[in-house]
Amino acid sequence: MSANDIKFFTPQIQLLDEVYKNASVTANLDGNSALVSMTANGNEFQIPVMDMDGLGEYNRKTGYPEGGVSLTFETKKPNIDRARVFIVEKMDNQESAGLAFGALSGEFLRTKAVPELDATRLATYCTKGKGKLTKTLDPNDGAVWVKALSNATVDMDNAEVPQNDRHLFITSDGLTAVNNMQTIESRAILARFADVTIVPQPRFVSAVKLLSGRDTEDKGGFAKADGATDLQFQIISGSAIMQWTKDIVNKIINPVENQDGDWWKFFFHLYGICEVYDNKVSGIYSCMKEATA
């Protein structure tokens, strides 16, 4: 791989970030990248962790009570670590190869990588979050959806989950049922959330199985895990989770150097972390369908 290869394809690689943001339904939960760094080996995240004690009595003689408020960094290994190799046949010039790579990688992100990433994140938050309701909601009855959403917000209010940082993820039929009511109650409940995002059902399940991309699972991707059920809505407080992702095309082999054949090879690596802070599990509320026999 030459430095010129990487330099030439850099514009296409940088555009992948925009493709991700536009295609992902969970990109709005991404943490502040300025607060996260990678370790020297580039394989682990350094995540900011806040620890704080409550106020104590100030004493005129002894001064401030012991304890305090601190920001430290905890090293975390990624729980998302996936990869693929893109192959582009040799073309007349490098410009054509760049356009082909841009189209290929963009389509791959939109149709393969992002749906898997969304599904993995939402399933992880469902598993680790505290709030759960297992009840199949009638898609033709908006009132039952409003009631379930109202009960969820009350639970989160009582758990002191920040009210201005709650993001609602909901199925299309669920949101349609609520909107079709056109009542004060239906409008009021949706106004409780920082934003409302429709999630396609294949990405919205309680657990996923990630396929290896090898042997009998050579197609890769993800599937609904055995025993998993469909999610109907999920409320997530941004402050309750740690979510960061890196996608890197960190290696390119041109047709001249490629010993496998007369084509370009682009090595794509997607890794990241999606976790729930141990002391903020009440910041996740998931409503899922009842299991069917």
Feature locations, PLM:
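Charged, low-complexity surface segments at secondary-structure and domain boundaries
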Residues: 1-4, 89-93, 131-139
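Sequence/fold signature of self-assembling virion shell proteins
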Residues: 2-31, 36-50, 54-56, 71-79, ...
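Short, glycine/acidic-enriched capping/hinge loops at junctions between secondary-structure elements
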Residues: 57-63
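Long, hydrophobic/aromatic-enriched structural stretches that serve as scaffold segments
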Residues: 66-116
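Hydrophobic alpha-helical segments and helix pairs
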Residues: 97-148
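Extended, solvent-exposed, turn-rich assembly/linker loops in the middle of proteins
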Residues: 130-197
